Design a protein with these regions (language model features):
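Conserved NTP-donor binding/palm subdomain of two-metal-ion nucleotidyltransferases/polymerases, i.e.
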Residues: 2-129, 135-358
């Protein structure tokens, strides 16, 4: 077990067989070929975890590009075709909603998969389980009321009690709405870790308008705001440091697509500055360290050194453990620290005696 594997044991990080898959997807040609053989011996495709399954379309493209032979080729091609159709259907259902919002004067910023699709160059290789968008906090209450009238039902755990929308918005960062097989995740804060009213100010300032289209339709698409590269990588990494019930590992190729697209031109000082401003050094440093040590990602060592958490750093480490551990494994103290970290980011002050753990 590598040092990084021991460091992440018991948390949300990719398991041994998932790391093999990631080496196929993200390593050089020679390493990819060896890793593919080992991965095929290690997994039973009939029982594969959801996180790995989501990357089968990307694996199809990778083995095709490298000319690798695998008995799984027909299944991988089928997974790619299925994902292509699913993503098409999702965008056809959701983009008209976003277009209506922009026509009504609501600024809409694409997050997560929707913001990353163009970087993959193919709508069929990157999974989209939903469409995540960010709107200004002031617009969110009206949109949360309007979506149900248009046939979108709130997820059971996201529906605020009547008249309690403000309470809902103060407690979390987003709400999901479903219609048929499509889902929109409406965000008023880009990250669950930072609910402060001004937390996304620089994200909005650095974003740029760009058309988001459905390939093959010939239409002009919908003009949305897209995050700057620095903000997109921060979102990908912080989200990747959270536990997920599906053992999601899509964040790894997402991050590497961004880093390899920009190479030496990537603005590392801006990324470090944003992480410090939002007190998110711990999850960013841990994910970047994983990418560097496991997959030889072009992450400079001085960047990791610059991401030391500021005092009281125990709060942010405890928050990291609370968010990256499976439910029931985080301690009460870790969960309390996660809430304290949100309070500090929102401009609050810690109670007396919280500068160091007791």
């Amino acid at each position: 077990m590598s040092a990084i594997s021991r460091r992440h044991a018991g948390l949300c990080w990719p398991r041994a067989h998932q790391r093999l898959l990631l080496r196929v997807l993200c390593g050089d040609a020679d390493r990819a070929s060896v890793a593919l053989e080992k991965w095929q011996q290690a997994v039973d495709l009939a029982r594969i975890d959801a996180g790995s399954l989501a990357l089968m379309p990307l694996l199809h493209r990778r083995v095709s590009e490298l000319g690798l032979r695998t008995p799984l080729a027909p299944l991988l091609k089928g997974a790619y075709r299925w994902r292509w159709c699913e993503n098409q259907l999702l965008l056809r259902e959701t983009l008209p909603v976003l277009a209506r919002w922009t026509t009504e004067g609501v600024p809409v910023l694409a997050l997560k998969g929707l913001a990353l699709l163009r970087r993959y160059g193919n709508i069929g290789v990157r999974p989209l389980s939903d469409v995540d968008v960010l709107v200004p906090r002031s617009h969110a209450p009206a949109l949360m009321r309007a979506l149900p009238t248009a046939g979108w039902r709130a997820r059971a755990d996201d529906a605020p009690p009547p008249g309690r929308t403000d309470d809902r918005m103060a407690a979390t960062h987003a709400a999901g709405f479903i219609r048929g097989r499509a889902e929109i995740d409406l965000h008023w804060a880009s990250l669950a870790e930072d609910l402060s009213p001004g937390g996304d100010e620089r994200l909005w300032q650095r974003s740029a308008a760009a058309p988001v289209t459905i390939p093959g339709t010939g239409g002009p698409g919908v003009s949305l705001r897209l995050p700057a590269t620095v903000d997109l990588l921060l979102q990908v990494c912080v989200h990747g440091a959270r536990w997920s019930r599906t053992s999601a590992i899509t964040w790894v190729p997402d991050a590497l697509v961004i880093l390899r697209e920009h190479g030496a031109a990537f603005d590392w000082p801006a990324l470090v500055a944003e992480a410090r401003a939002r007190r998110l050094q711990v999850p960013l440093a841990e994910t970047l360290r994983f990418l560097r040590e496991e997959l030889d990602a072009p992450v400079p060592a001085h960047v990791l050194a610059a991401l030391d958490a500021e005092a009281p750093d125990w709060i942010y480490w405890s928050e990291y453990f609370a968010r990256s551990a499976a439910p029931g494994r985080a301690t009460t103290a870790d969960r309390a620290a996660a809430r304290l970290a949100q309070i500090v980011r929102a401009g609050g002050t810690l109670p007396a005696g919280f500068s160091e753990p007791s």
